[in-house]
Amino acid sequence: MQFSGHPVSFFYPWRFISRELYRSVMVDFRDHGADRLVIVQEWMERILADHVFYLDLLEMVRDADMKLFEVHAPNGPHWDLSCVFEGRRGPMIEGHKRALCYAAETGCRTYTIHIGAGQYNRFRMPIPKLREAALRTLDELVPHAEKLGVVIAVENSFEPPNTPDEVLFLLEHFNSPALGCCYDAGHANVMAPAPGKRQELYCSVMKEIWDGHVIEYPDALGRLAPHVVTAHLHDNDGYRDAHALPGSGSVDWPVILSGLAACPNLISVQSEVHCDRAENEVTPGRICRKFADLFA
C-alpha cells in the first residue's frame, strides 16, 4: 500500500495474541493490501532480550510475504529520551543503540521515539531538566543512527514535555539528517484548538497532566513539516487519545493528508489504529480497507 508514493506500514498490538497466531494476522494484513509492518515497541523489547524470538519473527514475516519497515522504540520512563536517572541512562542508551542496529539490519528506515512524559506526570520534574536529558541522549544516539542509515523520528504527543515546541527544539538543535519527526495526527488533534472545543470536555488524563488547563497548539503539522519523516495516523474526538479509525473522529483528513504529501523529507506513513480497544471495533482487514479508501 502506498500514500502519495510513500510506503504505508501497519501497527498491531501483538502482545494480546499468542505467537501461534502471528502468521495468520500477518496474512490477513497481506490479503487486504498491506505489505509492511511496524516493529512495535513490545516486539523490540522482546528482540533485545531474546535473539531466538528475533529469528522466529524474521521467519514468520518472510513466510507471510511481508516486510518490516519501521520501528517504534521501547518507551516508558526507563526508555524515554528524557530519562534523568543516571543509574538507568547507560543501559537505556545502550539498548537504543542495539535496537537501531536491529532496525538497520531488517531494512527499517525510521525509529520512532518518545521524549517522554512519565517523569513529569509523576513528579512534575522541571521541563528544562527533561530537555537537557533528552539532548544528552540524542548526543549519543544521533551519530550512531547516522552511521547505520536509520532516521530517529521524535514523536509529538499531548503532554507538556512532548509538545510540538519541545520536538522542534530538539530537531533544530541537532539539524541532522539522522534526526526527524514522527508526526502523530491523533496526538496533534487532541492538542489542536477547534470551533466549539471546550476545556471541560477533555478527558481526566489530559486535565491532570495539564493541571486543569490544556495549552492548545494550532497547526502542529505546518510547524513540524520540514522535519517530518514518518507519521502515525489515527483518529479521535479531540479530547482523548483514542487511536481510532480515520473518519470516526474529528481529524480533518483532507488537510492532514495534503500537508503530509507536501512534507519534503517524508519517508513513510503508518497506521497506528489500535485493535485492542473494544470501542474501536477494528480488524486488520477493516483497517486496510479504511486506509485504502483514505488514500484513494
Model segments located where?
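N-terminal pre-domain/capping segments
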Residues: M1-E105, D139, S176, G180, ...
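A cross-domain feature marking catalytic cores of carbohydrate-active enzymes
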Residues: G5-W14, I39-W43, E70-N75, I113-I115, ...
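Acidic-and-aromatic substrate-binding clefts and catalytic sites of carbohydrate-active enzymes
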Residues: F11-L21, V40-L55, W79-S82, G118-R124, ...
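Charged helix-capping and loop-helix junction motifs
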Residues: E20-L21, D50-D56, R89, I93-H96, ...
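Active-site acidic/histidine proton-transfer and metal-coordination neighborhood
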Residues: S24, M60-D63, S82-Y183, V190
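Conserved, mostly hydrophobic/aromatic
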Residues: F29, V61, M92, A103, ...
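Acidic/histidine-rich catalytic cores of soluble enzymes
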Residues: L37, V71, R136-S250
